[in-house]
From Swiss-Prot:
Top-level taxon in the UniProt lineage: Eukaryota
Residue sites binding FAD per the record: 134-149, 160-192
The protein's assembly and partners: Monomer. Component of the 2-(3-amino-3-carboxypropyl)histidine synthase complex composed of DPH1, DPH2, DPH3 and a NADH-dependent reductase, predominantly CBR1.
Pfam families for the chain: FAD_binding_6, NAD_binding_1
Transmembrane segments: 18-38
Keywords assigned: FAD, Flavoprotein, Membrane, Mitochondrion, Mitochondrion outer membrane, NAD, Oxidoreductase, Transferase, Transmembrane, Transmembrane helix
Described function: NADH-dependent reductase for DPH3 and cytochrome b5. Required for the first step of diphthamide biosynthesis, a post-translational modification of histidine which occurs in elongation factor 2. DPH1 and DPH2 transfer a 3-amino-3-carboxypropyl (ACP) group from S-adenosyl-L-methionine (SAM) to a histidine residue, the reaction is assisted by a reduction system comprising DPH3 and a NADH-dependent reductase, predominantly CBR1. By reducing DPH3, also involved in the formation of the tRNA wobble base modification mcm5s 2U (5-methoxycarbonylmethyl-2-thiouridine), mediated by the elongator complex.
Protein name: NADH-cytochrome b5 reductase 1
Metabolic or biological pathway, per its Swiss-Prot or TrEMBL entry: Protein modification; peptidyl-diphthamide biosynthesis
Length: 294
């Protein structure tokens, strides 16, 4: 009798489905990316609280004129951001002579600045908060809450901005200008008329002129002085309808006019704007108004 040989079964190994492998890898990568950006967003935590004053330390004071300075305040962590939309402002509060005093200021820094924020403040003889801040030494704190305001800038929201600023009224304009010019996808044109008493009163002039030199097709600046030196290239006196008509864009549906400065100046500019075809400014400006007063 012959012997029969049993052949053991051969195990077959199936090839992995490439589509399943790809889907698995893609899922893992997507999960990792999502986790990464979640952690990054947590790192850059906005710290402002609209209904609660918080203390922030003064970390640097940069003198920019005889009565104005940039005050840099630290955030809790170097990866924190203030949490202030472009065009809005904060409130500084203090107890002065037994009374609670609150004033609004717009930082000149933008919200992508991490670890600190900058305020440009002019010290007035009768300005309670401005003197309060000016009297602070590095390491001392001020109390701030926010954000506040009805204007929030988004890229390309209009074709062009006409801006009229007086003195420290340059602060919200500077913040908006910075946000526009640092974004290569933002095609907004900016025309700024900036008024001051003397040439030494022009705040952030070097920074503004550098912006204009680097972006001549996007930013135009015209300076106006009450007291001008010899060979002054700008206008002399007050901002007039003629100056506005010459140096700012014409009224149109895709042009907004932004105003910020001393109350008498702003009042005169609102009247001039109407003469030039802009809509009458409302008592309280809101986003979407053709003429917005900060």
């Amino acid at each position: 009798m012959s012997e029969t040989t049993t052949v053991p079964p051969i195990e077959t190994v199936s090839e992995p489905n490439p589509f399943i492998v790809f889907a698995t890898v893609a899922t893992i990568i997507s999960a990792f990316i999502g986790y990464y950006f979640l952690q990054q967003s947590k790192k850059h935590t906005p710290v402002l609280k609209p209904d609660e004053f918080q203390k922030f330390p003064l970390i640097e004071k940069i003198r920019v004129s005889h009565n104005s300075a940039i005050y840099r305040f630290g955030l809790p962590k170097s990866t924190d951001r203030l949490g202030l939309p472009i065009g809005q402002h904060i409130s500084i509060g203090a107890t002065i002579d037994g009374k609670e005093v609150v004033r609004s200021y717009t930082p000149i820094s933008t919200d992508d600045q991490l670890g600190h924020f900058d305020l440009l403040i002019k010290t007035y003889e009768n300005g309670n908060i401005s003197r309060h801040v000016a009297g602070k030494n590095v390491g001392e704190h001020i109390e701030i809450r926010g954000p506040k305001g009805f204007f929030t800038y988004t890229p390309n929201m209009v074709k062009s901005f006409g801006m009229i600023a007086g003195g420290t009224g340059i602060a919200p304009m500077y913040q908006i200008i910075t946000a526009i010019l640092k974004n290569p996808e933002d095609k907004t044109k900016i025309h700024l008329v900036y008024a001051n008493v003397t040439e030494s009163d022009i705040l952030l002039k070097e920074e503004l002129d550098n912006f204009a030199a680097r972006h001549p097709d996007r930013l135009k600046i015209h300076y106006v002085l009450n007291e001008a030196p010899a060979n002054w290239q700008g206008s002399v006196g007050f901002v007039t309808p003629e100056i506005i008509d010459t140096h700012l864009p014409k009224a149109s549906n895709d042009t907004n006019l932004l105003l910020c400065g001393p109350p008498p100046m702003v009042s005169a500019m609102k009247k001039a704007a109407v003469e030039l075809g802009f809509q009458k400014a409302k008592p309280v400006s809101k986003l979407g108004d053709q003429v917005f007063v900060f």
